Amino acid sequence: MRLLLLTFLGVCCLTPWVVEGVGTEVLEESSCVNLQTQRLPVQKIKTYIIWEGAMRAVIFVTKRGLKICADPEAKWVKAAIKTVDGRASTRKNMAETVPTGAQRSTSTAITLTG
């Protein structure tokens, strides 16, 4: 009885390592299978990811959350990346801008004496 219990306990302890090995066969979530050749409107692109996996690609993420793989060597892809980077740097510059001039106080405390 003790031998059976000890064997069962040993199998339970080894199970996590055996199951972990099976998961390595699953493809990664963001891997590209094929590349988009048709030009994507730049105004629909929110951001992009440069993918260096089995297939080198640029993954564009649209404003609706769709992920589209494209050839990083295509001219339209390079132009889209420049545009998206330009928008990001413009937003960053606007966020870093400090307003000049005096600002009025927004505190409107009223003191009553009686």
UniProtKB/Swiss-Prot annotation:
GO terms for biological process: cellular response to interleukin-4; cellular response to transforming growth factor beta stimulus; chemotaxis; establishment of localization in cell; immune response; mature natural killer cell chemotaxis; negative regulation of CD4-positive, alpha-beta T cell proliferation; negative regulation of DNA-templated transcription. Expressed in activated CD8(+) T cells. In the thymus, expressed by medullary thymic epithelial cells. InterPro entries: Chemokine_b/g/d, Chemokine_IL8-like_dom, Chemokine_XCL1/XCL2, Interleukin_8-like_sf. Disulfide bonds join 32-69. Disruption phenotype: The thymus of knockout mice shows a lower medullary accumulation of dendritic cells. Animals have a defective generation of naturally ocurring regulatory T cells. Residues 1-21 form the signal peptide. Keywords: Chemotaxis, Cytokine, Disulfide bond, Secreted, Signal. Residues 100-114 have a biased composition (Polar residues). GO terms for molecular function: chemokine activity; chemokine receptor binding; protein homodimerization activity. Pfam families: IL8. Residues 92-114 are annotated as: Disordered. Its main location: secreted. The keyword Secreted applies. GO terms for cellular component: extracellular space. It comes from the Eukaryota. It is found in: Secreted. SUPFAM superfamilies: Interleukin 8-like chemokines. Belongs to the intercrine gamma family. Chemotactic activity for lymphocytes but not for monocytes or neutrophils. In thymus, mediates medullary accumulation of thymic dendritic cells and contributes to regulatoy T cell development, playing a role in self-tolerance establishment. This is Lymphotactin.
